[in-house]
Amino acid sequence: MNEKEKMLSGRLYYASDPDLRDDYISAKRLVQKFNQCAYTNKDKADSILRDLLGSAGTNIQIEPPFRCDYGKNIMVGDNFYANYDCIILDVCRVQIGSNVMLGPRVCLFTAAHPIDYEVRNLGLEYGRPISVGDNVWIGGCVTVNPGIRIGSDAVIGSGSVITKSIPEGVVAAGNPCKVLRKINQYDKVYWQNMRYERMQ
């Protein structure tokens, strides 16, 4: 098993591995090109994103600056929006569903380091995958830690630090992030009424 295979499977691996470094630098070059042209040449920026990401649906919008490690381990669905300063450390797979919105400075970290300093000082790292369901809104300055799953239809309050997985259909917030309540029919009625009033 090579270092890339170890990395993607969640085993300890050497991030300094030459093949991984080549992939990392290639991704950084694409990220730099994307950030430079995102507002001046949308077609070129979209093409760069298609080359950078592992897969991407339709209607993808990422505000620069954007940062990631490899890009190829990031899969996003349709109608994805990420605001400024999004950071995705994708040493493992990051699966993002459709109709997902990320506020400014949202960080998704699959990367982790050993607690034992002797192992850590050898340059060994590991990762855990992250998944985000459909119709999720993650507020600004949220940190999603390695191995987290966020269920579909969830709303995450700004400034949250997610250390445990979040179920679907809830509002969650805090440091550490905790479920505050379920999203219910009253929420739907309220926001549909707001939408109706807007059209008057």
Give residue spans per PLM region:
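Short-chain dehydrogenase/reductase
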Residues: 137, 155, 171-173
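Flexible, glycine/small-residue-enriched loop-and-beta-strand segment within the central core
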Residues: 39, 66-76, 81-149, 175-176, ...
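Short conserved AdoMet
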Residues: 54-57, 133, 149, 167
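Short secondary-structure boundary/capping segments
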Residues: 4-5, 52, 98, 122, ...
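Terminal amphipathic alpha-helical/low-complexity segments used for targeting or macromolecular assembly
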Residues: 1-59, 177-200
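Beta-rich strand-turn-strand
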Residues: 139-165
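A contiguous, mid-protein "functional segment" used to position or interact
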Residues: 161-182
